[in-house]
């Protein structure tokens, strides 16, 4: 384990697998998350998904990110509860959140891990053509999970964020990803930290905002500023601000 040089939040740490192995989401992943918070109950720990677009920037080596911080997702409430047969000791619910999040809570971490694996297996195979969700196309898997584990009120908690990385001709960077009209803000992966409610924006925005600030304060037509057009990739003239 080491602390991140980026320090996106308090005590931002990265936990690496001692062996060089690629990112994967499975039963072992859930067990590792709970092993960590069993030793460090004051920390939160999560894993990026194991697929491109919905995963982190590094998929070639297994790692986790944690810290001593309460994210907006951790504080979000459950808006609908449900039960799963055979898991009476696990509280289940859908979190009130912009993404699809299943929250499992209980004192028996083995039960939570087993149910997490069951949900993962079910989601991997899930298809709903009405909303454009396909489990796989041409042998390529699209469904995975971004898991986040923590403790609350003496209980173990895991948030399972359902992800799908399918692309289309209209949305080549992902159907369930910021679309082209938002790419001037961010088109990079939406990873673990963003999923939990903390925006990690590209550093280029700092330069872009400085140019825009100068243009706005001086009442300049941004469509006449080449630097702005190249930075935000506008292909058509923009109306004066």
Regions found by a protein language model. Give the residues of each.
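Accessory, solvent-exposed terminal regions and/or long lumenal/extracellular loops of proteins
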Residues: 219-220, 239
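Helical (often loop-to-helix) elements that flank the catalytic cores of nucleotide-handling enzymes
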Residues: 67-88
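An amphipathic alpha-helical core segment
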Residues: 222, 227-231
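Catalytic residues for metal-mediated phosphoryl-transfer on nucleic acids/nucleotides
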Residues: 1-49, 70, 91, 95-218
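Single conserved hydrophobic/aromatic residue that forms the stacking wall/gate
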Residues: 232-241
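Histidine-centered catalytic micro-motifs
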Residues: 59-69
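Conserved alpha/beta core surface patches that mediate binding of polyanionic ligands
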Residues: 1, 60, 82-83
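Short, conserved secondary-structure transition motifs
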Residues: 51-59
């Amino acid at each position: 384990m080491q602390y991140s040089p980026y320090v996106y939040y308090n005590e931002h740490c990265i936990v690496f697998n001692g062996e060089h192995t690629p990112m994967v989401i499975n039963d072992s992943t859930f067990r590792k998350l709970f092993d960590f918070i069993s030793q460090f109950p004051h920390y939160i720990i999560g894993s990026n998904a194991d697929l491109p677009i919905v995963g982190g920037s590094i998929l070639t080596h297994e790692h986790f990110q944690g810290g001593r911080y309460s994210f907006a997702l951790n504080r979000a409430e459950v808006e609908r509860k449900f039960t799963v047969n055979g898991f009476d000791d696990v509280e289940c619910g859908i979190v009130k959140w912009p993404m699809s999040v299943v929250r499992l809570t209980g004192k028996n971490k083995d039960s939570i891990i087993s149910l997490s694996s069951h949900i993962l297996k079910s989601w991997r195979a899930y298809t709903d053509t009405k909303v454009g969700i396909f489990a796989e196309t041409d042998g390529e898997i699209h469904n995975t999970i971004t898991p986040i584990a923590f403790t609350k009120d003496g209980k173990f908690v895991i948030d399972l964020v359902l992800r799908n990385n399918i692309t289309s001709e209209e949305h080549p960077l992902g159907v369930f990803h910021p679309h082209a009209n938002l790419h001037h803000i961010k088109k990079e992966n939406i990873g673990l930290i963003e999923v939990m409610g903390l925006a990690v924006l590209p550093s280029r925005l700092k330069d872009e905002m400085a140019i825009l600030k100068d243009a706005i304060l001086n009442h300049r037509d941004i469509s006449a500023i080449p630097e702005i057009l190249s930075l935000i990739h506008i292909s058509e003239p923009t109306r004066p601000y």
